[in-house]
């Protein structure tokens, strides 16, 4: 949990930071103590417009995000890892996702849009020690403007090489600002046993979508220019690349591959999935279900096989189960899981001695009437599935999409996780580490510059409420499960 040491002046705290304020600006002193910063006014003035957030955490790393360009000369210290200064809004260079240097011009953005950021390693330095082979910093700093309609400056930083189950102070300093305690984060404890497999789940791709919003429409002018890809395509390519860098051995796309399931959109989605750097499993969502279009044949021509009947894939440490909940009619947002399909999912989960991860598009509905829009599976079908799974294999995690948000809840021994879309705020993908004794989920934002600029803009949807509702809490996004302890 991040515990900020300062309040953005004149800003509401609701939905921005977790509880746990630490009072006025403080600076680390002797071991086990803190002392007030002498230049508290200057620190507040320089950093009030730069809210830092811990978006993701796992057992060995943390992802930090920010909405505005960092102040000049900003350094972050986490444990004994010290970053190079993060680029300010006036920097003449754009640092790509993994530290390569790009000039901020249209040619660069075109290359990033078509091929994605190149990989490399940005060194971490510091007075106490330099980062070793297993401790490195990867960071991203945006240019002043990506899309002229939106203020630029959002960024992400991933700090690796941390110790599991350890609380770290996040210490910041900048030009003219002394070192002070900016926050605190605790890494997760991994499940017992060895790490066996890593996979990534992505949801609600919506290939073919050109605008976002319900109460008002947000348009992506960058994606409409020559040589640029639309934001759903950029977002999925960026997520694929970053998940592969993270170590994912398999991608699972949890439905809504397209916007309207036209033949052209299905072909574009199939080609996009076929170009992924790792194998792909996919299920269909309500946006993929259109009468008169043979979606399965179209996707199969690109090597993407989806079936109406549930199927399984065994990986080290777990059985992965996939089922389509798109239903057999054209009612928008409606999910269906007939009893026969629910029983088949439970049979697949109970056939093996390993735990199971079930991937659906629509989440189970735990109440008789939907309390959240869009609705998930019908309540009766949800209860039948959950009861059957609880009896067949209590060590089961159900991962869903559809609602474009991050939430975690349970039913008996089962854990249910909803994860957000790749293409709207927060613009993220979910990583799953499968251990001998459990599974660890972490949801990270995609940091590719032309993706981050768009997803930051979409947080303004629904009169600004989307940015508060969609990301969920840190505990909804990142958690560790030990089988038999839930």
Model-derived features: where do they sit?
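N-terminal active-site segment of His-dependent metallophosphoesterases
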Residues: 49-50, 56, 63, 70, ...
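Extended active-site neighborhood of metal-dependent phosphoesterases/phosphodiesterases
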Residues: 173-174, 184-191, 267-347, 384-385, ...
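Active-site environment of divalent metal-dependent phosphoester hydrolases
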Residues: 208-211, 259-264, 286-293, 328-332, ...
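Surface-exposed, short loops/turns at beta-strand junctions within beta-sandwich domains
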Residues: 159-166
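Acidic/histidine-rich helix-loop elements
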Residues: 90-102, 203-234, 290-305, 328-337, ...
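Beta-strand-turn-beta hairpins that frame and shape the catalytic cleft
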Residues: 189-200, 208-214, 312-322, 351-356, ...
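His/acidic metal-ligating clusters that form di-metal
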Residues: 63-65, 72, 84, 239-250, ...
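A short C-terminal boundary segment appended to hydrolase-like catalytic domains
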Residues: 436-486
